[in-house]
């Protein structure tokens, strides 16, 4: 171990930093128990993305577009084995895991808010907001459709946690505006997240584009002249990823 430390293969605490197996990707709600091995854990928690609002039915001179959905909040941090074990022990031997579902695309209205993802009560990452019902515009006007707001700030409630172990803690990004400029119309792109790309804002002839990966916002939708109403797209689901290091 001394040799490894001298050549820089372990840190001052003696951790080798070797990844033990593939990361554990938790995409469904359940319970988290202490891993059998590992001395250091990187924990990534992603709230779900917001859905996009639907586009309105249009007349021979009407247009409609919605903005993209907002992204979910995100936390990434390190815990030692002793720290994680103590937190699990206090919670009764396991942590309840809640994985937020992506916001549902609007049907005749606004998109849904993404669900909150929780690592017990220790890390809470709210989902992104859905975008509003698509604007009603026309060939003689210019209008903007607001994107979904970002997810609220995450909450880290780990007693005594050294702030240097928090890699990233941030609210999600807002969705992009949709726009209608007299005749052309383009919906807003969904917000990206650290673990996914937002759905693409669609043109009048394109189909819905859901959020990709995890925690990203849905792409907005749009309608050209004389079109039936078009449902919004769905945001990306939340996730928890745990990496175990020797």
Where are these regions (language model features)?
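Right-handed beta-helix
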Residues: 1, 210-224
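Glycine-rich, low-complexity segments
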Residues: 1-28, 132-141, 152, 161-162
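Glycine-rich, acidic and aromatic/proline-enriched surface loops and short helix-turn segments
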Residues: 9, 48, 216
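Surface-exposed ligand/attachment interfaces on beta-rich extracellular proteins
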Residues: 15, 23-38, 108-112, 116-117, ...
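Beta-rich globular "head" domains
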Residues: 19-57, 158, 162-164, 169-173, ...
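Glycine-rich strand-loop-strand elements at beta-sheet edges
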Residues: 45-121, 219-242
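Acidic, glycine-rich loop-and-strand cores that form catalytic or ligand-binding grooves
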Residues: 129-209
């Amino acid at each position: 171990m001394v040799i490894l430390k001298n050549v820089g293969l372990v840190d001052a605490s003696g951790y080798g930093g070797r990844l033990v197996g593939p990361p554990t990707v938790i995409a469904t709600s359940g319970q988290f128990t202490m891993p059998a091995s590992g001395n250091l854990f990187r924990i990534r928690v992603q709230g779900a993305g917001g859905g996009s609002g639907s586009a309105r039915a249009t007349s021979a001179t009407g247009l409609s577009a919605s903005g993209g959905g907002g992204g979910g909040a995100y936390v990434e941090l390190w815990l030692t084995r002793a720290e994680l074990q103590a937190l699990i022990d206090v919670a009764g031997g396991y942590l309840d895991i809640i994985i937020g579902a992506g916001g549902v695309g609007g049907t005749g209205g606004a998109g849904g808010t993404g669900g909150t993802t929780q690592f017990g009560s220790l890390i809470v990452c709210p989902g992104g907001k859905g975008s509003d019902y698509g604007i009603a515009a026309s060939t003689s006007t210019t209008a903007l459709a607001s994107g979904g707001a970002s997810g609220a700030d995450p909450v880290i409630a780990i007693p005594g946690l050294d702030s240097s172990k928090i890699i990233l803690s941030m609210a999600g990004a807002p969705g992009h505006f949709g726009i209608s400029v007299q005749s052309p119309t383009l919906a807003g792109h969904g917000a990206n997240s650290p673990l996914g790309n937002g759905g693409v804002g669609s043109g009048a002839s394109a189909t819905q584009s859901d959020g990709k990966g995890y925690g990203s916002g849905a792409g907005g939708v749009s309608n050209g002249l004389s079109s039936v109403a078009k449902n919004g797209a769905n945001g990306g689901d939340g996730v928890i990823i745990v990496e175990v290091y020797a």
